[in-house]
């Protein structure tokens, strides 16, 4: 019999890998109610514009699923004690709300009548799971202080549903204990969140950063950190393109001024060869100095004072270039123009041979064509 290795993780790894493979492609089309209470408005704008794909591993995806699996059990618990729960609309779908032309929305876990604390009052239902530490904080401080995003989410649902109370139910993932808390509708908070949502959807550029550098506590582990404080360029898709606009006439529509058409979600995710980064998203390393009607943009590289152009460099090449000092470099420009070279992902000066003369103007000639036999 073949001896077992000292430690086996193959089965667990395969399970997590399957979660990653089956995860929904791309980011969700709308700005979620669960996000709008986030402390950083810049984060929300970059998220709405798909500036960087969230990178969740299989374990995290399974953890999210565990939270979703708790919802039907809590509904069954409520019905078992005589509470009337409405968790589906007339079409059998989860209750869903949309706002700001369909670009903002969320799915409410349900509404309940007959809760022991107030049997005659309809409540918005919000279900969450938490580890022991977070659970203890919620019990001690309440949801508004310990989980302000959850509190804001319920304010939106109450405002959209026309209800003035919510019931917050949280399950301790370690002990299966349940914390229940009634929440009162705050009209000022609802209006603030709605105005914020409208500002994010219609804004042509993001808000300023929360901190002065990437070591600021709230920024330290943010996925947009390198775009806000370093030279990372955004991912290429229609939402990071200066030609696209979120329209406000319903159905979460986006339009493209370059191709004069409405964009499907799939088209938004793919982008096209005419993509041009929203200039401010390259503001850490480049400044737009000229733009013409032929979609030709000229930038000044802030690191080197050299100029570079789109279409010489595609948006994807700008994003893929790790060392942004390459953009506009004389040899890099010559290689691009004369030899139709391509900047690949992770490119930088360190990847080039040591004997290449990177200083001064260099003219690279096209290779001679081979003589025909």
Residue map of PLM features:
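A generic structural motif
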Residues: 111-115, 171, 257-259
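Short linker/helix segments within small regulatory modules
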Residues: 260-266
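Metal-dependent nuclease catalytic regions and adjoining charged, substrate-binding loops involved
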Residues: 137, 141-151, 156, 160-255, ...
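A generic structural signal for short, solvent-exposed coil/turn residues
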Residues: 102, 116-119, 160, 214, ...
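Conserved active-site beta-strand-loop modules that form the wall/rim of enzyme catalytic pockets
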Residues: 120-127, 164-168
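Short, flexible coil/linker segments at or flanking structured domains
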Residues: 4, 19, 24-27, 32-34, ...
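Metal-dependent nuclease catalytic cores that hydrolyze phosphodiester bonds in DNA/RNA
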Residues: 1-124, 131-133, 273, 281, ...
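A short beta-strand motif that forms part of the nucleic acid-binding face
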Residues: 128-131, 172-173, 260
């Amino acid at each position: 019999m073949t001896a077992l290795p000292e430690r086996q993780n193959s089965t667990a790894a395969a399970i997590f890998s399957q979660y990653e493979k089956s995860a929904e492609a791309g980011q969700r089309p709308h700005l979620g109610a669960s996000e709008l209470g986030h402390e950083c408005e810049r984060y929300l704008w970059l998220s709405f514009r798909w500036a960087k794909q969230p990178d969740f591993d299989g374990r995290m995806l399974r953890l999210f699923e565990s939270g979703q699996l708790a919802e039907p059990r809590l509904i069954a618990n409520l019905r078992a004690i005589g509470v009337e729960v409405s968790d589906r609309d007339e079409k059998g779908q989860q209750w869903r709300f949309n706002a700001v032309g369909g670009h903002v929305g969320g799915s409410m876990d349900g509404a309940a009548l007959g809760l022991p604390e107030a049997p005659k009052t309809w409540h918005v239902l919000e279900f969450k799971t938490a580890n022991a530490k977070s659970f203890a904080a919620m019990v001690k401080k309440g949801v508004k202080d310990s989980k302000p995003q959850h509190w804001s989410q319920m304010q939106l649902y109450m405002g959209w549903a026309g209800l003035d109370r919510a019931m917050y139910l949280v399950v301790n993932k370690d002990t299966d204990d349940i914390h229940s808390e009634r929440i009162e509708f705050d009209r000022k908070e609802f209006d603030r969140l709605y105005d914020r949502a409208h500002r994010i959807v219609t804004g042509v550029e993001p808000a300023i950063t929360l901190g002065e550098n990437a070591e600021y506590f709230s920024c330290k582990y943010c996925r947009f950190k390198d775009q806000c404080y370093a030279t990372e360029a955004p991912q290429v898709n229609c939402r990071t393109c200066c030609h696209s606009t979120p329209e406000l006439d319903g159905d979460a529509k986006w339009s493209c001024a370059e191709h004069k058409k409405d964009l499907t979600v799939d088209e938004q995710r793919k982008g096209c060869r005419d993509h041009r980064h929203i200039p401010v998203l390259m503001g850490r390393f480049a400044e737009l100095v000229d733009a013409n009607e032929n979609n030709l943009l000229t930038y000044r590289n802030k690191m080197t004072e050299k100029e570079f152009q789109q279409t010489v460099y595609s948006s994807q090449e700008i994003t893929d270039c790790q060392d942004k000092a390459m953009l506009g470099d004389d040899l890099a420009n010559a290689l691009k123009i004369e030899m139709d070279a391509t900047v690949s992902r992770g490119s930088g000066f360190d990847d080039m041979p040591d004997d290449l003369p990177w200083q001064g103007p260099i003219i690279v000639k096209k290779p001679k064509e081979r003589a025909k036999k």
